[in-house]
C-alpha cells in the first residue's frame, strides 16, 4: 500500500453499489489508496506510537493497520479483506463487538497500563484528528471521549461542548456534546 505500490480492487458482481462513492466506477488505484489511507490512524494523532506499539505497527503502515482492523470504523460499515478471505463484518465490526479497553486507556491518556492485557477489537486505529480520543461502550452505546492536548490550555473539549449548546439554543442540527471525567 506504499506510494509506488499498485493494489487491485475486486468487487463481487452485483455489489458495486455497496462501495464508498469515491470507488464506484474507479478504474485506477488512486482512489482505492486514498480510501485505504483514510482507514488508518493519522500520523499526527496524540500518542500514535504508543497506540500502535502493541501491534508492532507504524502510522505509515496502511497495510498492517488494515490487516489488524480489517479497515473497520465506527463511521461506516466497510470491511476490507484480502481476496479469498470470507466476510468479516460480524467478527470485526465495532458496533457489535467489545473494544480493547487497554488500548482505549493508551489512546486517551498515553499511559500504558501495567499488568494488563488487551482484548477485544482495536477501535483506536481509524478515528481521524490529532487530539487524544477513544471510543467506549457506555450503557450499550458507543461514545467517543475526547481530551485536550497536553501542550494546550485544555479548552478544546469545553469549546466543543459550548458550540453544541449554542447550536441547540439556536435550533440548529448538531451533534450533542457533554462534559465528563474518565
Indicate residue ranges for each PLM-predicted region.
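P-loop NTPase switch module centered on the Walker A-proximal segment
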Residues: 1-114
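Conserved ATP-binding subdomain of kinase catalytic cores across diverse folds
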Residues: 96-182
Amino acid at each position: 500500500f506504499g506510494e509506488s505500490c499498485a493494489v487491485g480492487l475486486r468487487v463481487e458482481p452485483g455489489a458495486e453499489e455497496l462501495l464508498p462513492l469515491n470507488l464506484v466506477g474507479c478504474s485506477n488505484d488512486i482512489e482505492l489508496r486514498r480510501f485505504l489511507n483514510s482507514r488508518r490512524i493519522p500520523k499526527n494523532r496524540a500518542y500514535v506510537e504508543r497506540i500502535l506499539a502493541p501491534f508492532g505497527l507504524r502510522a505509515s503502515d496502511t497495510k498492517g493497520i488494515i490487516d489488524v482492523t480489517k479497515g473497520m470504523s465506527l463511521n461506516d460499515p466497510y470491511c476490507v479483506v484480502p481476496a479469498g478471505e470470507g466476510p468479516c463484518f460480524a467478527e470485526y465490526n465495532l458496533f457489535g463487538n467489545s473494544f480493547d479497553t487497554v488500548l482505549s486507556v493508551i489512546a486517551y491518556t498515553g499511559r500504558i497500563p501495567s499488568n494488563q492485557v488487551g482484548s477485544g477489537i482495536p477501535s483506536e486505529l481509524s478515528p481521524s484528528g490529532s487530539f487524544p480520543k477513544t471510543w467506549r461502550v457506555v450503557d450499550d452505546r458507543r461514545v467517543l471521549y475526547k481530551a485536550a492536548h497536553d501542550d494546550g490550555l485544555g479548552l478544546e473539549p469545553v469549546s466543543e461542548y459550548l458550540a453544541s449548546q449554542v447550536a441547540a439554543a439556536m435550533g440548529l442540527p448538531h451533534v450533542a456534546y457533554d462534559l465528563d471525567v474518565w
